[in-house]
Amino acid sequence: MNKKLIVTICIALLAAITVITTKLLQNNGIVLNTSTIYTMLTLTILLAICLLNTTIRTKLQHVCCDLDWAEVTSKFYNNIPEIYRKSFWITFGLINVAFLFHTINFMWGGDDWGAVRYATKLKDGLSEGRFSAYWLQELLFNGKILPVINNLWTFAGLALAGILLAYYWNLPKKTSTYVVISLFFAVTPYTLSWLYYAKNTLGNLWLPAFVLSSLILSEKKSENINKSYFYNILAILLCIIALGTYLPIVSFIAIAVIGKVIMGLITSEKTFIQTLQEFTQSLSNLLASFMLFAFIITILQEKSIMANAYNTQLESIFAIFAKLPQMLYSMIEQLILPMPFLDIAYKFFYIIIILTALFTIIFKCNTPKNALTSILLLVLALVCTKLTYLFSIQSLSNPNYVARIDFYSLPLFYTLMLSIVLKLSNPTQYKYTFIFAILIVFMSFVRVAYAQKVWKFGWDAETKLVDRIITRLEKIPEFNINKQYKLVQVGEQSLRKNYYVKRNNEYQSNELLNSAYYKEGKGKEAYNFYYQTDFIKEDASNHAFNDPQIKEYILHNARAWPAKESLAIINDYIIIILNEDRLAQIRATLNR
């Protein structure tokens, strides 16, 4: 019989065995999600192909049976230069200290109740075009959000990103420099904004490490053409994963590349064109990544899998030009605009770093032409901090200043400025700049600690509020613990604000302060979370207000919590009124 036919039959049999085994497991109550089934099937087929190929089978046997993996791992680790190993562990430890309170208390945000109780799924981000948003969570923890270890893995990614950033920008190879640069980037309230979204924390905070790895691999050269292909394919894959997780990462990519170009200009006499020619492969890989990403998005849209979400739907060319003046204004204003835990004094220290970097370039750059080019590139980097605002469709979810989006731009821009000063400094200036950077890092630690305190108090207060709501619900005669209700929650109570000392003219941030843990329209998973039964089957839509009895109650009887009339059970609906202003809005709509 033909050898290829035998191989095909064997693979088909193995695939059939996998499918049958999966069915048997499901019939016996062991439920496997779709991604797990596909993974098992793919691995089975790959294993079959490998085992049937003599060359591959021999190599696998050597890898599995002959190698001492403890020795191989130890050798690989020891081959990493000590400065990188030492810097990573110091940075990793200090980042964990900065966010220790959050890690210990295992907090999450108002969008995470279902994901924490059950797990994230690979398909969850597809409707927004975020096709790789949860793959890392799925790979490491089978989609589950776990206490302590989730944050540890997240901060490992942040620490790695800091080390890779210092390496990519070719900063002085000192442990102190690498650690300070890493902390300068990683420990800020912008980072904390992603910890409000527990289901996104791991995937999104690893993106800088993926992007920097991609850029470094793109520059890696090898005499072995197969290795070169491997490096470039891996670089493109990492970039696609980053884009498919969260598109605003384009700001990070742009600023990182601009920073690399600037570092080349300020330390040599090469022209801008000569410096740019060194990035041919990197730019080619980035272009390939964007094209493949666009191709995937097109397929998702054509198959009606993806909706036009704000983070992937682009503005028209006319709208972009119309937004340019506001974008340029926002680009400057963001440097001085106070936000929760980002007060004006804190931002003033960053402005000092920016001005110092500009003067350092002017007086220390090798040639006046390169100095001018570098300053123009810094302006371009500042423009890139607002790419998401400029190109994406404007919505309530995408105002001018969003802390979680700014995480991919502003901290990196500030770090670029510090890196320029450290790169061009003489020993005396280096020492004073280093001390000043440590002062800013300390201020960041203080603000992050304060934010975590405010978050914990708000979390406890909102949870106790919901306890009181449920206790009162149970006393309503119509309440039946075994019945399934639809929830109508009018408004929400974000109580983090009660523990925060607000300053004048402060721009509000949802993830840092304003968003509630028990959100309007997303109460099902939250209210079921601590209760003995899943008494809420779904969050009711606005169509619920068309019900005559509910409409009558809203217009004439309802009052905001803690009034007795703030709770009602009407047929299959539980109605909770938490905010007077929101109640007034709904009444105005119903009276039209």
PLM ranges: what are they?
Residues V31-S35, L46, W69, T73-S127, ...:
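Intrinsically disordered, polar/acidic, low-complexity terminal segments
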Residues F279-I352:
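Membrane-lumen/periplasm interface segments of specific transmembrane helices
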Residues F230-L247, F252-I258:
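Membrane-interface alpha helices of multi-pass inner-membrane proteins
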Residues L217-I241, E269-L276, K431-I435:
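Short hydrophobic alpha-helices at membrane interfaces in multi-pass membrane enzymes
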Residues Y229-N232, K423-V448:
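Signature aromatic-anchored transmembrane alpha helix within multi-pass, membrane-resident enzymes
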Residues I163, I344-L372:
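Hydrophobic, aromatic-rich transmembrane alpha-helices
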